[in-house]
Amino acid sequence: QPVIQKDTFGNRTELSYELDGKIKDVRRSGNHQRILQQYEYNARRQITGVVDGNQNPISYDVDSWGRITGIGFADGVKEGYEYTPAGQVSRTIDGNGNAVQYRYNSLGKISERIDQLGFTETFRYDEEGNLSLHIDRDGRQLQRACNVFGQPVYEKASDAEGKHTNISTWHYDSLGRVTRAVCDGKSYEYIYDAYGNLKEKRSNGKRLVSYTHDRAGQITEIRDPAGVCTRYEYDILGRRSRIFNDDGLEVRYGYDALNRIRHIRYGNGVETAYTYDGDGNIRTLETRAGENVLISFAYRYDGNGNRTAKAGTQAALGGITSEITTGNNALDLSYAYDVRGQLLEERRNGTSVCYAYDKAGNRIRKTDAQGETRYLYNEKNQLVEEESPADRKQFSYDRQGGIIEEKNAAGIRLFSYNSRRQQTRVETETGNVQENRYDAEGLRFELLENGRRTSFVYHDGELLQEEGREEQGTSYHLGAGMEAFRRGQELSYYHRDEQLSTVFVTDGQGEIRNSYQYDAFGIPLETTEQLNNRIRYTGQQYDELTEQYYLRARYYNPVAGRFMQEDVYQGDGLNLYAYCGNNPVVYDDPSGYKRKACPPQGKISERVDESGSKPIGATYEGTIYRSVDSRYDPLEMSQYTINSNHRYTESGVPGLYFSSGEKIVKAELGNYDVFDFSNRTMYSYDVRLTNMLDVSNPSVRSQLGISLESIVGEGYDVTHAIGRYAYSNGYNGIIAPSARADGGINIILFNAKGVK
């Protein structure tokens, strides 16, 4: 019997099942019915294939344990996976046949990673299982000491000769909250209120950021180092409804019945309106300044949710004036993709840019109006040569995977890194020099461009204030995105497209001051500025001197369409340089670690802050029982549950389960006939909640088109679909209602390490 789910707008999702309860297919019906996914199984009822929404088959080879040993795509590309007897991944083979090997210690922790060229990086651990030493492939060493709770208190990074040391230290209070962090001479102190919310962040004794919260823990005010504040109001459902201050800032939000932003109204009279299709994709986007239409677009998508068309108008500016030019402002874009979801063609007003990729996802060819550009790679998927009609570039890398040299027709561009493998210096072929410094939060707090210093202050990883580039500092106002900035007495507003990229900046009277257009990978096509502005493509910082985007963990080169450093995360595809899996139309990667849907769909929390997550300082009491002879810290276990099969997790979707208190966890274990707890130890943690999919919230269930009964019943097909959705879209975990204890809440963390 099919299970039919219906959302507030009448969109239906139909799930069909095999006789044994395995999900057969998922169909969506609105104006017409279509199949979103179909599933295939072998005689052991292990999944062997999926047919996607575009009817492209994906095949899975599985061993007798149900572990995936191969993934095959419709274009003949195949990836391979091998395992240890204990079930850990021991070898991955990309589409070009190049392999990375992994070795583990007796506790199942990774001890060595051997790359495609045979270079090894080493990992060592203390008696509690915490990482104590990491030696990378260039010989750089990171030594770490942790407290009894597994929190880092000391780190020393040095080069292969033990020189160029970089030391970080952390201090915590009795509740495990960080109170002081120091790195590279930059010291942060953190002060909390009586309810555990972050009240103030200081640096070397000077106040940087202060916060005010309401009784529900929601941020009601943020004040930056210059004293500029942003205030927040929320509606009865806890959704951000307004940001404002006493200096004229005003942004109001309206939502539809599924909690999606319906409109944004700015204090200067500009308004942006959204409509959505049955899958939650943006159908139309329009931004108006009075009678003037700045942006008006309609969008179409394929069966996998890839955007295939964007048609409408975007206002053009006459020179650097604020007058909108008359005439044809039409902008008609279309996109085509291969069976792996990689962008093959971007057509802009009839002019095409085409891309081709090898079996490992490396761009090997780009064809545009200027001609053909070809790219060559080594076994590690590193770009080593780029040849275009105008230039020939050659690239060199260190053993750890960071670019160190680019030779081109104009000269040589050099890149340098510190002992933590963070990019610290770029010297361009024209003699310009950019230097970067980083704090204990891993963020760039200082930038020097040819000796000219700019300092940055962040809130939750988002830029809040900068000083040095202008005669007067710049204060940023954060809301659903980067909403506005104040420089001196002048207030300006940001206006974004469907990718969250800045397309216009308007002043306090609604006049256009800046205008931007980009290609799909973020290359600036048209830039008209009266005001200096670094917030550009996908809302991220653009460094004009080096022509890179700063994406926190790494730097992104839009011309090459790839990162310039190897990803330290190993879970976002086997190609560690590809930007967003070569699909920048649908995804972005603000962290530099992992792509996510842009804009994210279904990211709703009962109490949201500027990042769409739980407020700073909010915690969850997570309780878990483990056998007293268990060798593992429970918070370590999530990374080893890749093949577990539980309510929200399955093969390929790891997760660790907590319950909201002892009573709930005992009820959960009782389902497995566990009633004697004398040989078990109870662990209780204050787990910070950030970027969680909260299906305990009825409004979120409505948005996703699921019922409470479908996720607390006996079958796991709906919950497994939720788990796959949350994991693949970059959520940190799931908040879910307990299936065994009324009123109980469970939390599932995809990677629980470091959540305390």
Summary of predicted features, one role per range:
Residues 569-573:
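Short linker/helix segments within small regulatory modules
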Residues 373-379, 384-385, 471, 488-552, ...:
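A motif-centric feature for acidic-aromatic and gly/ser/thr-rich catalytic loops and repeats
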Residues 650-659:
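A short, exposed loop/beta-hairpin motif centered on an aromatic-Gly-Thr core
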